Amino acid sequence: MGLWDVDKIEYVGRAKGPKEDFAFHYYDADKVVAGKKMKDWLRFGVAWWHTFNQELVDPFGTGTAHRPYYKYTDPMDQALAKVDYAFELFQKLGVEYFCFHDRDIAPEGDTLRETNANLDKVVDKIEENMKSTGVKLLWNTSSLFTNPRFVSGAATSPFADIYAYAGGQLKKSLEIGKRLGAENYVFWGGREGYENLWNTEMKRETDHIAKFFHMCADYAKEIGFEAQFLIEPKPKEPTLHQYDFDAATAIEFLRNHDLTDVFKLNLEGNHANLAGHTYQHEIRVARESGFLGSLDANQGDKLIGWDMDEFPTDLYETVAVMWEVLQAGSIGPHGGLNFDAKPRRTSFYEEDLFRSHIAGMDTYAAGLLVADKMNQDGFIQDLMAERYSSYDSGIGKDIDEGNVTLADLEAYSLDKPQSELIAATKSDHLESVKATINNYIIDALSEVE
């Protein structure tokens, strides 16, 4: 059976009934949906930090997780052992990608030189496993937020020595990405923001991080690292206010600092909620602006105001996400769905690592099937066409084509009575729209055998 006491997870469809929990009911990797295999639409990835390092602690209690590699007490021995466990889990789940922070995979030494040596040993083993299994690196990144040195940020730190250290750490991380063939490279600024504006030079800090990003882009070009760079927005936590607040803020930052040719966005569901948005909103903003890069698949609890990193089980949300992906044609140029999620503290058995990923993978596969059915029927397209039909001719067409002035609009409107203006509006029938989406969910999934 291997290192994990779990068999390879297979697709069974709906034939074995809803209670079969160690199998995929909807994720059929090679099933063709909208012209591509399901696995190529979804491109699932496993997050190293939550899956192999998360001990399931919370602010009120110690970890509950049972993990087989805890028998290795030496940090380096455990780090090397995790590589074997990780790649067996990838294969048993049928997941073709993974993601990690540099400090996830190897323990830190006292100096950057010592830490880099530790990284090299683990990366050697990861590279061997990648070659033998065919599993690929969706993206890597650098942890510039966990160590106390980054208490006031990394590339926005008021302390130049810390900024310099962060640059050295990034250099090594980019080299690892190049070596392992990472398809993307993510920047998440957990400490890049402020706690209080009274002691913060905001423009200076954002200029500093822009310079940092330009240095990273220059070095990637120098070493031939062609991964897509991604910024991951989050409004807060751990910092009171983070500079990459949401998709719109991050895009504006990129435009202001001449970084639009280098970066796209990696968007996360729970981060969208913390910013007061739906996940679909953030994806729509990025998609329509040309900045959709990759997705972190998780969800938050709508009643709790912090980052829960739950595995995605909200089918309505995954339908919305996959609808946006279908309109885009892919999850960015090289993106995927990375499960930036952890089992609940009460789901602490080894097998729960598999159960949780199965739940997330099936929920996104189901979302894809429903979104595809809606897309084939043209339901949303027809809805949009009808709602905006007044712009197909007359004054509306002139507005769309930029052929009118304010004076033209005034002349058109001056003598129109209120009754005519009210008559020009139409009901959205919004409740029926939502009910129809529910019907599509039921109908599309009932067709799965």
Curated annotation (Swiss-Prot):
<protein>
    <recommendedName>
        <fullName>Xylose isomerase</fullName>
        <ecNumber>5.3.1.5</ecNumber>
    </recommendedName>
</protein>
<keyword id="KW-0859">Xylose metabolism</keyword>
<keyword id="KW-0119">Carbohydrate metabolism</keyword>
<dbReference type="Pfam" id="PF01261">
    <property type="entry name" value="AP_endonuc_2"/>
</dbReference>
<keyword id="KW-0963">Cytoplasm</keyword>
<dbReference type="GO" id="GO:0042732">
    <property type="term" value="P:D-xylose metabolic process"/>
</dbReference>
<dbReference type="GO" id="GO:0009045">
    <property type="term" value="F:xylose isomerase activity"/>
</dbReference>
<dbReference type="InterPro" id="IPR001998">
    <property type="entry name" value="Xylose_isomerase"/>
</dbReference>
<dbReference type="GO" id="GO:0005737">
    <property type="term" value="C:cytoplasm"/>
</dbReference>
<keyword id="KW-0460">Magnesium</keyword>
<dbReference type="InterPro" id="IPR036237">
    <property type="entry name" value="Xyl_isomerase-like_sf"/>
</dbReference>
<dbReference type="InterPro" id="IPR013022">
    <property type="entry name" value="Xyl_isomerase-like_TIM-brl"/>
</dbReference>
<feature type="binding site">
    <location>
        <position position="309"/>
    </location>
    <ligand>
        <name>Mg(2+) 2</name>
    </ligand>
</feature>
<feature type="binding site">
    <location>
        <position position="271"/>
    </location>
    <ligand>
        <name>Mg(2+) 2</name>
    </ligand>
</feature>
<comment type="similarity">
    <text>Belongs to the xylose isomerase family.</text>
</comment>
<feature type="binding site">
    <location>
        <position position="307"/>
    </location>
    <ligand>
        <name>Mg(2+) 2</name>
    </ligand>
</feature>
<keyword id="KW-0479">Metal-binding</keyword>
<feature type="active site">
    <location>
        <position position="101"/>
    </location>
</feature>
<feature type="binding site">
    <location>
        <position position="296"/>
    </location>
    <ligand>
        <name>Mg(2+) 1</name>
    </ligand>
</feature>
<feature type="active site">
    <location>
        <position position="104"/>
    </location>
</feature>
<dbReference type="InterPro" id="IPR013452">
    <property type="entry name" value="Xylose_isom_bac"/>
</dbReference>
<dbReference type="GO" id="GO:0000287">
    <property type="term" value="F:magnesium ion binding"/>
</dbReference>
<feature type="binding site">
    <location>
        <position position="268"/>
    </location>
    <ligand>
        <name>Mg(2+) 1</name>
    </ligand>
</feature>
<feature type="binding site">
    <location>
        <position position="340"/>
    </location>
    <ligand>
        <name>Mg(2+) 1</name>
    </ligand>
</feature>
<keyword id="KW-0413">Isomerase</keyword>
<comment type="subunit">
    <text>Homotetramer.</text>
</comment>
<feature type="binding site">
    <location>
        <position position="268"/>
    </location>
    <ligand>
        <name>Mg(2+) 2</name>
    </ligand>
</feature>
<feature type="binding site">
    <location>
        <position position="232"/>
    </location>
    <ligand>
        <name>Mg(2+) 1</name>
    </ligand>
</feature>
